[in-house]
């Protein structure tokens, strides 16, 4: 079996050429920083879904507006694409917003915040444990002090400190 099917090769070529067209040919102020993230082509090469991502915007409406602008300019983009790609059939183009990048960033931020909260919780737990072990050491030291009995080393062997024989 071949490594890549014809539809995959056509999709890659369309992705590359549309990215260049968007960068150099389309001058609409309503478009943000649009990039082509993926292209899916039907088996008969008559339809192509172009997934776009819009950078520098957190607003979902701005991304949808960019997709609408590109869908309005589909005829022009398709004619430019036809000049760049030699194909018997030029697919009908449909621009769709790709939310996977934004979802990935949102999930990554959630994971990062959970890790920060967990680390802060562990730091707080460790300081509580250190405080309790310091308190236990204080109790142990006070017990050692009460058990300590002074022995008079100056007295003679075999006699207690009160002078009685052992």
UniProtKB/Swiss-Prot annotation:
Location in or out of the cell: Cytoplasm
Gene3D superfamilies assigned to the protein according to its UniProt record, in alphabetical order: 3.30.300.20
Transmembrane segments: none
SUPFAM superfamilies xref list: Ribosome-binding factor A, RbfA (SSF89919)
Any Gene Ontology CC annotation: cytosol
Record-linked HAMAP family: RbfA
Name assigned to this protein: Ribosome-binding factor A
Native species: Pseudoalteromonas translucida (strain TAC 125)
Record lineage: Bacteria, Pseudomonadati, Pseudomonadota, Gammaproteobacteria, Alteromonadales
């Amino acid at each position: 079996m071949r490594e890549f099917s014809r539809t995959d090769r056509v999709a890659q070529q369309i992705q590359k050429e549309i990215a260049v067209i968007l960068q150099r040919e389309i001058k609409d102020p309503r478009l943000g920083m649009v990039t082509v993230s993926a292209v899916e082509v039907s088996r008969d090469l008559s339809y192509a879904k172009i997934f776009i991502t819009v950078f520098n915007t957190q607003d979902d409406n701005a991304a949808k507006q960019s997709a609408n602008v590109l869908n309005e300019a589909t005829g022009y983009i398709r004619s430019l694409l036809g000049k760049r790609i030699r194909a018997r059939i030029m697919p009908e183009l449909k621009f769709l917003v790709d939310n996977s990048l934004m979802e990935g960033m949102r999930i990554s931020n959630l994971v990062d915040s959970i890790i920060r909260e967990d680390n802060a919780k562990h730091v707080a737990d460790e300081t509580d444990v250190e405080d309790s072990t310091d308190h236990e050491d204080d109790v142990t030291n006070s017990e050692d002090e009460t058990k300590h009995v002074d022995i008079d080393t100056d007295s003679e062997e075999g006699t207690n400190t009160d002078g009685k024989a052992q």
